[in-house]
Amino acid sequence: MRRLLSGEPIKLRANVNFLRLPMSKGEDYIVSLLRAAHVKFEREKTYPDLHGKRNVPLRFDFYLPDYQIHIEYDGIQHYQQISQFTNHKGYLAARERDRKKNSYCLARNLKLYRIPYWELSTIHNFNDLLRPQYLVKSKFHNDYLTPP
């Protein structure tokens, strides 16, 4: 089985009975920047010891193996409750998943860059994705960011 947009093989896991939704516009834009820079990347990177409720693996949007960097594109639903995505309980659960990914990377000295949706229009190339302000340095990285 292959991904629709990238043609990458999909690895199915025994304990996962769903596939991720298609990429958001922000994720698609990041893919275009990575490809333009000829940067190798993996989509939906998982680790066997990183999972959420009901043992569902938590996924990173992108992993760049040559740079050992993870990138997450955080849409508006990461910063405020949006009824088309979820209710308040679901929003809080998503925030907790973000914190868990942050903590996971910090504990293992893995680099994680979080790109907030309102910054996307200022990003024009691969190097722009790696701005210091996007590098996660705290479990609560997103908690103090507010959309303009």
Model regions: which residues?
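Nucleic-acid endo/exonuclease domains
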Residues: 1-148
